[in-house]
Protein backbone atom coordinates (compact mmCIF):
# COMPACT_ATOMS: atom_id res chain seq x y z
CA UNK A 1 0.00 0.00 0.00
CA UNK A 2 2.73 2.46 0.95
CA UNK A 3 5.21 1.35 -1.69
CA UNK A 4 8.03 0.05 0.52
CA UNK A 5 8.15 -3.48 -0.92
CA UNK A 6 9.40 -4.67 -4.30
CA UNK A 7 9.05 -8.11 -5.87
CA UNK A 8 6.64 -11.05 -5.96
CA UNK A 9 8.64 -14.17 -5.10
CA UNK A 10 11.89 -12.48 -4.11
CA UNK A 11 10.72 -9.51 -2.08
CA UNK A 12 12.61 -6.63 -0.51
CA UNK A 13 10.96 -4.39 2.08
CA UNK A 14 12.90 -1.42 3.46
CA UNK A 15 12.31 1.11 6.23
CA UNK A 16 14.21 3.97 7.78
CA UNK A 17 14.98 7.66 7.33
CA UNK A 18 18.08 9.71 6.68
CA UNK A 19 18.41 10.93 10.28
CA UNK A 20 16.61 8.12 12.06
CA UNK A 21 18.41 5.61 14.29
CA UNK A 22 18.79 2.93 11.61
CA UNK A 23 17.86 1.50 8.24
CA UNK A 24 16.26 -1.93 8.08
CA UNK A 25 15.26 -4.44 5.42
CA UNK A 26 13.45 -7.75 5.18
CA UNK A 27 14.48 -9.93 2.25
CA UNK A 28 12.10 -12.82 1.63
CA UNK A 29 12.18 -15.62 -0.91
CA UNK A 30 15.89 -16.35 -1.05
CA UNK A 31 16.36 -20.10 -1.61
CA UNK A 32 17.95 -22.03 1.26
CA UNK A 33 21.54 -23.22 1.19
CA UNK A 34 23.16 -20.15 -0.34
CA UNK A 35 26.49 -19.45 1.31
CA UNK A 36 26.24 -15.88 2.60
CA UNK A 37 28.54 -13.82 4.81
CA UNK A 38 28.63 -10.25 6.05
CA UNK A 39 31.54 -9.66 3.68
CA UNK A 40 29.31 -10.53 0.70
CA UNK A 41 27.04 -7.63 1.62
CA UNK A 42 29.67 -5.25 2.94
CA UNK A 43 31.66 -5.32 -0.29
CA UNK A 44 28.94 -3.51 -2.23
CA UNK A 45 28.00 -1.27 0.69
CA UNK A 46 31.58 -0.02 0.84
CA UNK A 47 31.34 0.88 -2.85
CA UNK A 48 28.24 3.00 -2.16
CA UNK A 49 28.96 4.48 1.26
CA UNK A 50 29.47 8.26 1.68
CA UNK A 51 32.68 10.07 2.46
CA UNK A 52 34.95 7.92 0.30
CA UNK A 53 36.34 10.81 -1.79
CA UNK A 54 36.30 14.59 -1.95
CA UNK A 55 33.73 14.36 -4.75
CA UNK A 56 30.95 12.93 -2.55
CA UNK A 57 29.17 13.95 0.64
CA UNK A 58 31.45 14.11 3.64
CA UNK A 59 28.89 12.46 5.90
CA UNK A 60 30.89 9.65 7.51
CA UNK A 61 28.71 6.56 7.71
CA UNK A 62 30.48 3.19 8.00
CA UNK A 63 27.35 1.45 6.69
CA UNK A 64 28.19 -1.72 8.58
CA UNK A 65 25.41 -4.20 7.98
CA UNK A 66 24.10 -6.69 10.53
CA UNK A 67 22.31 -9.90 9.56
CA UNK A 68 19.55 -10.48 12.11
CA UNK A 69 17.87 -13.59 10.72
CA UNK A 70 17.64 -16.02 7.84
CA UNK A 71 21.29 -17.11 7.87
CA UNK A 72 22.61 -19.98 9.98
CA UNK A 73 26.13 -21.37 9.99
CA UNK A 74 26.97 -19.29 6.95
CA UNK A 75 24.03 -20.40 4.78
CA UNK A 76 20.58 -19.02 4.06
CA UNK A 77 17.80 -20.98 5.72
CA UNK A 78 14.96 -20.08 3.36
CA UNK A 79 13.39 -17.88 6.04
CA UNK A 80 13.20 -14.11 5.78
CA UNK A 81 16.56 -12.36 6.04
CA UNK A 82 16.55 -9.38 8.40
CA UNK A 83 19.15 -6.66 7.84
CA UNK A 84 20.12 -3.62 9.90
CA UNK A 85 22.40 -0.63 9.26
CA UNK A 86 22.73 1.90 12.07
CA UNK A 87 22.97 5.62 11.28
CA UNK A 88 25.91 7.11 13.17
CA UNK A 89 26.70 10.55 11.70
CA UNK A 90 23.48 12.57 11.61
CA UNK A 91 23.65 16.35 11.97
CA UNK A 92 19.97 17.20 12.21
CA UNK A 93 20.63 20.77 13.38
CA UNK A 94 21.76 21.56 9.82
CA UNK A 95 18.08 21.42 8.81
CA UNK A 96 16.39 23.31 11.66
CA UNK A 97 16.40 26.59 9.72
CA UNK A 98 14.44 25.10 6.81
CA UNK A 99 11.94 22.90 8.66
CA UNK A 100 9.04 25.11 7.51
CA UNK A 101 10.43 25.74 4.02
CA UNK A 102 10.24 23.67 0.86
CA UNK A 103 13.59 23.06 -0.80
CA UNK A 104 13.29 23.48 -4.59
CA UNK A 105 13.26 20.21 -6.57
CA UNK A 106 13.11 18.11 -3.39
CA UNK A 107 10.30 15.90 -2.13
CA UNK A 108 9.49 18.34 0.70
CA UNK A 109 6.52 19.95 -1.04
CA UNK A 110 4.98 16.74 -2.41
CA UNK A 111 5.48 14.75 0.83
CA UNK A 112 3.82 17.60 2.76
CA UNK A 113 0.77 17.50 0.50
CA UNK A 114 0.55 13.70 0.59
CA UNK A 115 1.04 13.04 4.30
CA UNK A 116 0.46 16.37 6.05
CA UNK A 117 3.64 15.69 8.03
CA UNK A 118 7.22 15.15 6.97
CA UNK A 119 10.64 14.46 8.43
CA UNK A 120 12.55 17.54 7.29
CA UNK A 121 15.94 16.22 8.49
CA UNK A 122 17.87 15.40 5.36
CA UNK A 123 14.71 14.56 3.46
CA UNK A 124 13.67 11.76 5.80
CA UNK A 125 12.40 8.77 3.86
CA UNK A 126 12.97 10.47 0.49
CA UNK A 127 16.73 10.71 1.08
CA UNK A 128 19.12 8.58 -0.96
CA UNK A 129 20.36 7.32 2.41
CA UNK A 130 17.59 4.74 2.02
CA UNK A 131 19.41 3.12 -0.90
CA UNK A 132 22.02 1.59 1.41
CA UNK A 133 19.48 -1.12 2.21
CA UNK A 134 18.75 -1.71 -1.45
CA UNK A 135 22.45 -2.34 -1.98
CA UNK A 136 22.58 -4.79 0.93
CA UNK A 137 19.52 -6.67 -0.35
CA UNK A 138 20.84 -6.54 -3.91
CA UNK A 139 24.09 -8.13 -2.77
CA UNK A 140 22.13 -11.20 -1.71
CA UNK A 141 20.50 -11.37 -5.14
CA UNK A 142 23.86 -10.86 -6.86
CA UNK A 143 25.39 -13.71 -4.87
CA UNK A 144 22.63 -16.10 -5.86
CA UNK A 145 22.59 -14.98 -9.49
CA UNK A 146 26.36 -15.46 -9.68
CA UNK A 147 25.82 -19.09 -8.65
CA UNK A 148 23.62 -19.36 -11.75
CA UNK A 149 26.25 -17.82 -14.03
CA UNK A 150 24.72 -14.32 -14.07
CA UNK A 151 27.07 -11.38 -13.49
CA UNK A 152 25.83 -7.80 -13.02
CA UNK A 153 28.18 -4.84 -13.37
CA UNK A 154 27.76 -1.11 -13.86
CA UNK A 155 29.76 1.99 -14.67
CA UNK A 156 29.41 5.73 -15.16
CA UNK A 157 28.97 6.56 -18.84
CA UNK A 158 28.54 10.34 -18.53
CA UNK A 159 29.09 13.04 -15.92
CA UNK A 160 27.60 16.40 -16.83
CA UNK A 161 28.78 17.19 -20.36
CA UNK A 162 31.64 14.66 -20.23
CA UNK A 163 30.86 11.41 -22.05
CA UNK A 164 32.88 8.42 -20.86
CA UNK A 165 33.55 5.72 -23.46
CA UNK A 166 33.70 2.13 -22.30
CA UNK A 167 37.24 0.78 -22.42
CA UNK A 168 37.69 -1.82 -19.71
CA UNK A 169 35.94 -3.24 -16.66
CA UNK A 170 39.32 -3.28 -14.91
CA UNK A 171 39.20 0.51 -14.58
CA UNK A 172 35.75 0.73 -13.00
CA UNK A 173 36.71 -0.25 -9.45
CA UNK A 174 39.96 1.72 -9.46
CA UNK A 175 38.61 5.29 -9.37
CA UNK A 176 36.00 7.27 -7.45
CA UNK A 177 33.75 7.71 -10.50
CA UNK A 178 33.34 4.07 -11.58
CA UNK A 179 34.77 5.25 -14.89
CA UNK A 180 35.54 2.51 -17.43
CA UNK A 181 38.10 4.80 -19.09
CA UNK A 182 41.14 5.50 -16.88
CA UNK A 183 42.20 8.33 -19.19
CA UNK A 184 39.04 10.29 -18.29
CA UNK A 185 39.54 10.32 -14.52
CA UNK A 186 41.73 13.44 -14.38
CA UNK A 187 39.19 15.36 -16.48
CA UNK A 188 36.35 14.22 -14.23
CA UNK A 189 38.24 15.27 -11.11
CA UNK A 190 39.00 18.72 -12.52
CA UNK A 191 35.36 19.18 -13.52
CA UNK A 192 34.12 18.23 -10.05
CA UNK A 193 36.65 20.49 -8.32
CA UNK A 194 35.44 23.45 -10.37
CA UNK A 195 31.82 22.52 -9.71
CA UNK A 196 32.47 22.60 -5.99
CA UNK A 197 34.05 26.04 -6.28
CA UNK A 198 30.97 27.18 -8.20
CA UNK A 199 28.77 25.83 -5.39
CA UNK A 200 26.72 23.91 -7.93
CA UNK A 201 25.83 20.34 -8.83
CA UNK A 202 25.52 18.18 -11.93
CA UNK A 203 23.78 15.07 -13.24
CA UNK A 204 25.15 11.78 -14.52
CA UNK A 205 24.39 8.73 -16.61
CA UNK A 206 24.96 5.19 -15.36
CA UNK A 207 25.06 2.04 -17.47
CA UNK A 208 24.37 -1.36 -15.90
CA UNK A 209 24.85 -4.69 -17.65
CA UNK A 210 23.77 -8.24 -16.79
CA UNK A 211 25.65 -11.03 -18.56
CA UNK A 212 24.82 -14.73 -18.55
CA UNK A 213 21.05 -14.24 -18.30
CA UNK A 214 19.24 -17.19 -19.87
CA UNK A 215 16.44 -16.64 -22.40
CA UNK A 216 12.91 -16.65 -21.03
CA UNK A 217 12.84 -14.27 -18.06
CA UNK A 218 9.94 -11.81 -18.07
CA UNK A 219 6.16 -12.04 -17.70
CA UNK A 220 4.11 -10.49 -20.51
CA UNK A 221 2.15 -8.40 -20.65
CA UNK A 222 2.26 -6.07 -17.66
CA UNK A 223 5.34 -7.59 -16.01
CA UNK A 224 7.60 -7.43 -19.03
CA UNK A 225 11.23 -7.64 -17.99
CA UNK A 226 12.07 -4.25 -19.49
CA UNK A 227 9.04 -2.68 -17.79
CA UNK A 228 10.08 -4.17 -14.44
CA UNK A 229 13.64 -2.94 -14.88
CA UNK A 230 12.42 0.54 -15.76
CA UNK A 231 10.16 0.48 -12.68
CA UNK A 232 12.98 -0.59 -10.37
CA UNK A 233 15.60 1.76 -11.77
CA UNK A 234 13.21 4.71 -11.85
CA UNK A 235 12.52 4.12 -8.16
CA UNK A 236 16.11 5.14 -7.33
CA UNK A 237 16.35 8.67 -5.94
CA UNK A 238 17.15 11.35 -8.55
CA UNK A 239 16.64 9.05 -11.55
CA UNK A 240 14.66 10.89 -14.24
CA UNK A 241 15.03 8.56 -17.19
CA UNK A 242 15.76 4.93 -18.09
CA UNK A 243 16.74 3.44 -21.44
CA UNK A 244 16.95 -0.23 -22.38
CA UNK A 245 19.47 -1.05 -25.10
CA UNK A 246 19.55 1.64 -27.77
CA UNK A 247 16.77 3.45 -25.91
CA UNK A 248 15.76 6.81 -27.35
CA UNK A 249 18.43 6.50 -30.04
CA UNK A 250 16.11 4.04 -31.80
CA UNK A 251 14.03 7.03 -32.93
CA UNK A 252 16.74 7.98 -35.43
CA UNK A 253 17.47 4.41 -36.51
CA UNK A 254 15.95 2.61 -39.46
CA UNK A 255 14.50 -0.85 -39.11
CA UNK A 256 17.37 -2.36 -41.05
CA UNK A 257 19.76 -0.86 -38.51
CA UNK A 258 17.81 -1.39 -35.30
CA UNK A 259 16.64 -4.97 -35.68
CA UNK A 260 18.99 -7.46 -34.07
CA UNK A 261 19.44 -10.04 -36.81
CA UNK A 262 20.13 -13.66 -35.92
CA UNK A 263 22.63 -16.08 -37.43
CA UNK A 264 23.53 -19.63 -36.34
CA UNK A 265 26.63 -18.10 -34.77
CA UNK A 266 24.73 -15.47 -32.76
CA UNK A 267 22.97 -12.10 -32.79
CA UNK A 268 24.56 -9.43 -34.99
CA UNK A 269 23.70 -6.54 -32.64
CA UNK A 270 21.99 -5.80 -29.33
CA UNK A 271 19.87 -2.70 -29.85
CA UNK A 272 17.09 -4.39 -27.86
CA UNK A 273 19.30 -4.51 -24.79
CA UNK A 274 18.86 -8.25 -24.35
CA UNK A 275 15.06 -8.16 -24.10
CA UNK A 276 12.61 -9.05 -26.88
CA UNK A 277 8.86 -8.82 -26.33
CA UNK A 278 9.49 -8.24 -22.65
CA UNK A 279 11.43 -11.52 -22.32
CA UNK A 280 15.18 -11.97 -21.99
CA UNK A 281 16.85 -13.15 -25.21
CA UNK A 282 20.06 -14.53 -23.73
CA UNK A 283 22.07 -11.51 -24.82
CA UNK A 284 23.54 -9.11 -22.25
CA UNK A 285 20.81 -7.00 -20.65
CA UNK A 286 21.82 -3.35 -20.92
CA UNK A 287 20.13 -0.42 -19.18
CA UNK A 288 21.07 3.24 -18.89
CA UNK A 289 19.74 5.64 -16.26
CA UNK A 290 19.89 9.42 -16.07
CA UNK A 291 20.24 11.09 -12.67
CA UNK A 292 19.38 14.74 -12.15
CA UNK A 293 21.73 17.27 -10.51
CA UNK A 294 21.63 17.35 -6.71
CA UNK A 295 19.01 19.85 -5.57
CA UNK A 296 20.73 20.63 -2.25
CA UNK A 297 23.20 23.39 -3.09
CA UNK A 298 24.31 26.54 -1.27
CA UNK A 299 23.23 28.86 -4.08
CA UNK A 300 19.95 30.53 -2.97
CA UNK A 301 16.80 29.27 -4.67
CA UNK A 302 13.28 30.70 -4.72
CA UNK A 303 10.55 28.76 -2.94
CA UNK A 304 7.70 29.13 -0.42
CA UNK A 305 7.13 28.24 3.23
CA UNK A 306 4.28 26.08 4.53
CA UNK A 307 2.01 29.14 4.60
CA UNK A 308 2.71 29.97 0.96
CA UNK A 309 4.95 32.96 1.58
CA UNK A 310 7.86 33.52 -0.84
CA UNK A 311 11.30 32.68 0.57
CA UNK A 312 14.86 32.15 -0.58
CA UNK A 313 16.25 28.76 0.44
CA UNK A 314 19.91 28.01 1.07
CA UNK A 315 20.50 24.36 1.86
CA UNK A 316 23.17 23.63 4.41
CA UNK A 317 24.38 20.18 5.35
CA UNK A 318 26.59 17.64 3.61
CA UNK A 319 25.49 16.68 0.14
CA UNK A 320 26.74 14.94 -2.98
CA UNK A 321 27.55 17.47 -5.73
CA UNK A 322 26.77 14.61 -8.13
CA UNK A 323 24.58 11.79 -6.82
CA UNK A 324 25.51 9.73 -9.86
CA UNK A 325 29.01 9.13 -8.50
CA UNK A 326 27.64 6.70 -5.91
CA UNK A 327 24.74 5.37 -8.00
CA UNK A 328 26.49 2.49 -9.78
CA UNK A 329 26.17 -0.04 -6.91
CA UNK A 330 22.55 1.01 -6.42
CA UNK A 331 21.70 0.40 -10.08
CA UNK A 332 23.43 -2.98 -9.95
CA UNK A 333 21.43 -3.88 -6.84
CA UNK A 334 18.07 -2.99 -8.37
CA UNK A 335 18.81 -4.90 -11.56
CA UNK A 336 19.84 -7.90 -9.45
CA UNK A 337 16.64 -7.77 -7.39
CA UNK A 338 14.52 -7.69 -10.56
CA UNK A 339 16.39 -10.56 -12.21
CA UNK A 340 16.32 -12.63 -9.03
CA UNK A 341 12.56 -12.20 -8.73
CA UNK A 342 11.99 -13.10 -12.37
CA UNK A 343 14.32 -16.08 -12.22
CA UNK A 344 12.26 -17.56 -9.39
CA UNK A 345 8.98 -16.70 -11.13
CA UNK A 346 10.19 -18.31 -14.37
CA UNK A 347 11.20 -21.41 -12.46
CA UNK A 348 7.80 -21.64 -10.81
CA UNK A 349 5.86 -21.69 -14.09
CA UNK A 350 8.29 -22.77 -16.79
CA UNK A 351 10.86 -25.07 -15.17
CA UNK A 352 9.74 -27.99 -17.33
CA UNK A 353 9.89 -26.13 -20.65
CA UNK A 354 12.42 -27.61 -23.06
CA UNK A 355 13.13 -26.35 -26.59
CA UNK A 356 15.58 -27.64 -29.18
CA UNK A 357 16.50 -24.18 -30.50
CA UNK A 358 20.06 -23.29 -29.47
CA UNK A 359 20.75 -20.36 -27.17
CA UNK A 360 22.50 -17.65 -29.17
CA UNK A 361 25.16 -15.28 -27.95
CA UNK A 362 26.26 -12.05 -29.58
CA UNK A 363 28.96 -11.95 -32.22
Curated annotation (Swiss-Prot):
Keywords, in A-Z order: Amino-acid biosynthesis, Aromatic amino acid biosynthesis, FAD, Flavoprotein, FMN, Lyase, NADP
InterPro entries: Chorismate_synth, Chorismate_synth_AroC_sf, Chorismate_synthase_CS
Cofactor binding: number and manner: Reduced FMN (FMNH(2)).
Catalytic activity: 5-O-(1-carboxyvinyl)-3-phosphoshikimate = chorismate + phosphate
This enzyme's EC code(s): 4.2.3.5
Gene Ontology cellular-component terms listed: cytosol
GO terms for MF: chorismate synthase activity; FMN binding
Enzyme class, broadest EC rank: lyase
Residues noted as binding NADP(+) in the record, renumbered to the chain: 48, 54
UniProt record, GO biological process: amino acid biosynthetic process; aromatic amino acid family biosynthetic process; chorismate biosynthetic process
UniProt region (Disordered), positions on chain: 44-63
Positions with a binding annotation for FMN: 125-127, 237-238, 277, 292-296, 318
Superkingdom as given in the UniProt entry: Bacteria
One Pfam assignment: Chorismate_synt
Cofactor(s) listed: FMNH2
Pathway noted in the entry: Metabolic intermediate biosynthesis; chorismate biosynthesis; chorismate from D-erythrose 4-phosphate and phosphoenolpyruvate: step 7/7
Family matches, as HAMAP family: Chorismate_synth
Subunit structure: Homotetramer.
Role noted for this protein: This reaction introduces a second double bond into the aromatic ring system.
Assigned protein family: Belongs to the chorismate synthase family.
Protein name as it appears in the record: Chorismate synthase
Source organism of this protein record: Pseudomonas fluorescens (strain ATCC BAA-477 / NRRL B-23932 / Pf-5)
Lineage, highest ranks first: Bacteria, Pseudomonadati, Pseudomonadota, Gammaproteobacteria, Pseudomonadales
Amino acid sequence: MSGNTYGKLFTVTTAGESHGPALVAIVDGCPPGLELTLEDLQRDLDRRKPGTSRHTTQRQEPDEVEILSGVFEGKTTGCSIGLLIRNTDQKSKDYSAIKDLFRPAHADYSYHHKYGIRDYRGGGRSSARETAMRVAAGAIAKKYLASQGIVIRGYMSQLGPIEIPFKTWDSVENNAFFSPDPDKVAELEAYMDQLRRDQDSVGAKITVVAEGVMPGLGEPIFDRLDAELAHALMSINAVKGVEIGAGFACVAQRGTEHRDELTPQGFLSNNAGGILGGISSGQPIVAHLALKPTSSITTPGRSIDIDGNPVDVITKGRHDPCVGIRATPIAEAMMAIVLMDHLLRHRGQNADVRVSTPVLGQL
